[in-house]
Amino acid sequence: MDNNETSVDSKSINNFETKTIHGSKSMDSGIYLDSSYKMDYPEMGLCIIINNKNFHKSTGMSARNGTDVDAANLRETFMALKYEVRNKNDLTREEIMELMDSVSKEDHSKRSSFVCVILSHGDEGVIFGTNGPVDLKKLTSFFRGDYCRSLTGKPKLFIIQACRGTELDCGIETDSGTDDDMACQKIPVEADFLYAYSTAPGYYSWRNSRDGSWFIQSLCAMLKLYAHKLEFMHILTRVNRKVATEFESFSLDATFHAKKQIPCIVSMLTKELYFYH
């Protein structure tokens, strides 16, 4: 398949009490909390890129043509941001889980953050290893604050290029133009995660066989332009706009022709994130 069509990344407590911490300052006071993540550790951190292109015949899933363009683009982009980039190709579901477990057990104490990019087929709540599905929640749980202590309080970014269902977006016409004194603070184990999904829940995610996926193209372009100027959520907003306004599917199948896409950002970050300091 090299006819420059766009493709999709899918598979063919009852009682409780509240506790008040007396004498504590309001989170809005700014007295105890810095407004942005500390990004001046000796290393920016790891960037793991899982690039699944070829799938076992038994899965019935097609090759993801164009994904190597995404992987190369991501590698260049995050290396420019001083991340240690590790590319992994065509991993089974077992290999993905083993990789995440292994990486989470590394010493990240000298690293400012962690990034994991997954390029694969997907469905809602799962991404696919080359031999079958992986529950995304299980995959990311290795990096929770109670499991990966050396990343506690640091930003953990998961970037997912995969379908989240089989709905199609036809579009609509528009007429409108951590410091030492914080060492004892307790934080939720799910804090400081950000999930950047290529598409909204339930929808297809589009990929071009020549240029790569719309989302990864846009993410890399916006990071190259703004990583040294803007906060990360502001960058992602620009990614959303670029995907939403500059791309439309082309397919010989009328069902899949002239469709749109909007990325979806789920943030549990507790501070602003800048890739510079």
From Swiss-Prot:
The modification N6-acetyllysine is found at residue 11. It is found in: Cytoplasm. Expressed in heart, brain, liver, and muscle but not in kidney or testis. Inhibited by BIRC6; following inhibition of BIRC6-caspase binding by DIABLO/SMAC, BIRC6 is subjected to caspase cleavage, leading to an increase in active caspases. The modification N-acetylmethionine is found at residue 1. GO terms for biological process: anterior neural tube closure; apoptotic process; axonal fasciculation; B cell homeostasis; cell fate commitment; cellular response to staurosporine; DNA damage response; epithelial cell apoptotic process. GO terms for molecular function: aspartic-type endopeptidase activity; cyclin-dependent protein serine/threonine kinase inhibitor activity; cysteine-type endopeptidase activity; cysteine-type peptidase activity; death receptor binding; endopeptidase activity; enzyme activator activity; peptidase activity. The modification Phosphoserine is found at residue 26. GO terms for cellular component: cytoplasm; cytosol; death-inducing signaling complex; glutamatergic synapse; neuronal cell body; nucleus; postsynaptic density. Belongs to the peptidase C14A family. Involved in the activation cascade of caspases responsible for apoptosis execution. At the onset of apoptosis, it proteolytically cleaves poly(ADP-ribose) polymerase PARP1 at a '216-Asp-|-Gly-217' bond. Cleaves and activates sterol regulatory element binding proteins (SREBPs) between the basic helix-loop-helix leucine zipper domain and the membrane attachment domain. Cleaves and activates caspase-6, -7 and -9 (CASP6, CASP7 and CASP9, respectively). Cleaves and inactivates interleukin-18 (IL18). Triggers cell adhesion in sympathetic neurons through RET cleavage. This is Caspase-3. The lineage of its organism: Eukaryota, Metazoa, Chordata, Craniata, Vertebrata.
